[in-house]
């Protein structure tokens, strides 16, 4: 494309389904970890986490409407604290997206195992094939993917809620089975509130896609709040539905929860439907993270934080060169990820997300003071209060994640951070040797249409 700009093709409903689809992945696989943290009380932890994420969503809504550029957090942090701080926030956001995709692919493969038992190697092979197929799809016109995701997400919403209602109305469901609500006490509840932030990483996909939206920016808050509500609804009902039938100990020993519970109540057909729709939901998650990872690179390249070749768009309006890099990184993590990957990712995710969200909150407060005249189609009420709540919450997320990280998680996180340093050094050196092509740029209303 000659103008090198992204197409504006996304409706409000598209953004809601893509953001919620990014949050709602293979819950029937990951729910084991939720029960391990806080038992049936995980539903309370999820609701608490969502309520604490809400101020952050409103902050994101204002910043997205003010600076609606692909790159999201990077652009905001760059405007508040400079090009270097923006670069490192960009690298942190990339970690969230890249590490999530293999996990989603594994989720699909694990659900396939419900229909036919497969080995860990076969799981990796299936996950790798899924990533290859999705690479080609992400280079197609965005509105095609958006329509596919909308159909898959809204269908899964209906199936998941229906399944949970069936569980709760079955004669084997008992409220007594939900007790004790918090087998690990307040410590388990608090840890879950901090670590389950991973299940809400998805609302932050909206800023990456906002440049391609075709509706008034003042309505962006609906996408944030709507996707958050739908996520809590599905997760909360799932916990109550299965928790009233099986024990926490049983959940810890099984491979995939909801379909196995369907078998227990004599509804194998329901388990098959859950697996099929769960797999489709994983595809929406995979697609959302992939699209946003490529647009993160696209936005960073426009600020000369990465090579300008990442701004190249194909005839469908997709950043195809950025898609190649995302595909390579995703494939690498998929092929070399150990079986304990799901144990690493919650803590690494929490630490990375906490730092990124803290930087975003601080940027929000600073830009309110330093750029008061910028047009804000959506403006947060009680800005200082929302900022303080978000700061306290993000610090708790960071703390909960760091204390739960084992040596394997620290090694993975450390290697990722070290991997980024050469890219940052290269960009800084090119600013000196080739300032015409690499001169630092910070996208803002002052220099963008």
Place the predicted regions along the sequence by residue.
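C-terminal membrane-solvent junction of multi-pass transporters and transport-like membrane proteins
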Residues: 12, 183, 309-320, 357-406
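Membrane-interface "cap" regions at the ends of multi-pass membrane proteins
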Residues: 1-41, 45, 53-58, 69-70, ...
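Extracellular loop-to-transmembrane helix junctions
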Residues: 26-118, 122-123, 227-231, 409-419
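Membrane-interface loop-to-helix entry segments
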Residues: 122-171, 180-186, 224-229, 349-359, ...
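Helix-loop-helix junctions that connect adjacent transmembrane segments
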Residues: 42-43, 117-122, 150-276
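Membrane-helix boundary/coupling elements in multi-pass transport proteins
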Residues: 92-106, 200, 205-213, 271-307, ...
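TM-loop-TM module centered on a large, flexible mid-protein loop between adjacent transmembrane helices
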Residues: 75-76, 82, 114-118, 225-289, ...
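A generic transmembrane alpha-helix motif of multi-pass inner-membrane proteins
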Residues: 48, 348, 352-353, 365-366, ...
């Amino acid at each position: 494309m000659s103008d090198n700009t992204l197409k504006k093709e996304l409706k409000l409903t598209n953004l809601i389904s893509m953001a919620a689809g990014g949050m709602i992945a293979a819950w029937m696989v990951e729910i084991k970890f939720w029960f391990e943290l806080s038992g049936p009380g995980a539903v309370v932890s999820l609701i608490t986490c969502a309520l604490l994420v809400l101020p952050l969503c409103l902050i994101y809504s204002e910043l997205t409407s003010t600076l609606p550029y692909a790159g999201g957090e990077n652009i905001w942090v760059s405007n508040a604290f400079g090009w270097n701080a923006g670069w490192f926030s960009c690298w942190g956001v990339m970690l969230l997206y890249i590490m999530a995709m293999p996990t989603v692919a594994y989720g699909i493969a694990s659900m396939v195992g419900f229909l036919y038992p497969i080995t860990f190697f076969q799981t990796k092979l299936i996950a790798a094939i899924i990533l290859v197929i999705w690479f080609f799809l992400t280079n197609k016109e965005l509105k095609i993917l958006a329509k596919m995701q909308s159909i898959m997400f809204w269908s899964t919403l209906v199936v998941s809620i229906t399944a949970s209602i069936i569980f709760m109305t079955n004669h084997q469901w008992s409220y007594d089975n939900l007790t004790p609500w918090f087998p690990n006490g307040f410590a388990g509840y608090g840890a879950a509130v901090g670590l389950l932030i991973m299940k809400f990483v998805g609302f932050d996909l909206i800023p990456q896609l906002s440049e391609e939206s075709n509706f008034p920016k003042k309505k962006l808050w609906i996408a944030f709040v709507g996707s958050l509500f739908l996520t809590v609804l599905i997760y909360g009902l799932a916990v109550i539905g299965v928790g009233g039938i099986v024990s926490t100990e049983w959940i810890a020993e099984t491979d995939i929860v909801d379909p196995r519970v369907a078998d227990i109540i004599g509804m194998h057909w329901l388990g098959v439907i859950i697996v099929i729709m769960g797999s489709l939901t994983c595809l929406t998650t995979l697609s959302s993270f992939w699209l946003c990872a490529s647009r993160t690179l696209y936005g960073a390249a426009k600020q000369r934080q990465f090579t300008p070749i990442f701004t190249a768009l194909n005839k469908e309006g997709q950043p195809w060169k950025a898609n190649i890099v995302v595909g390579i990184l995703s494939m690498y993590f998929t092929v070399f990820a150990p079986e304990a990957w799901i144990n690493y990712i919650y803590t690494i995710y929490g630490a990375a997300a906490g730092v990124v969200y803290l930087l975003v909150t601080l940027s929000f407060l600073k830009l309110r003071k330093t750029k008061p005249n910028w047009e804000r189609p959506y403006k947060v009420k009680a800005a200082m209060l929302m900022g303080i709540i978000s700061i306290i919450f993000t610090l708790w997320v960071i703390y909960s994640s760091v204390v739960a990280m084992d040596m394997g998680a620290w090694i993975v996180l450390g290697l990722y951070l070290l991997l980024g340093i050469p890219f940052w050094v290269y960009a800084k050196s090119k600013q000196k040797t080739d300032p015409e092509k690499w001169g630092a740029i910070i996208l803002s209303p002052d220099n963008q249409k």
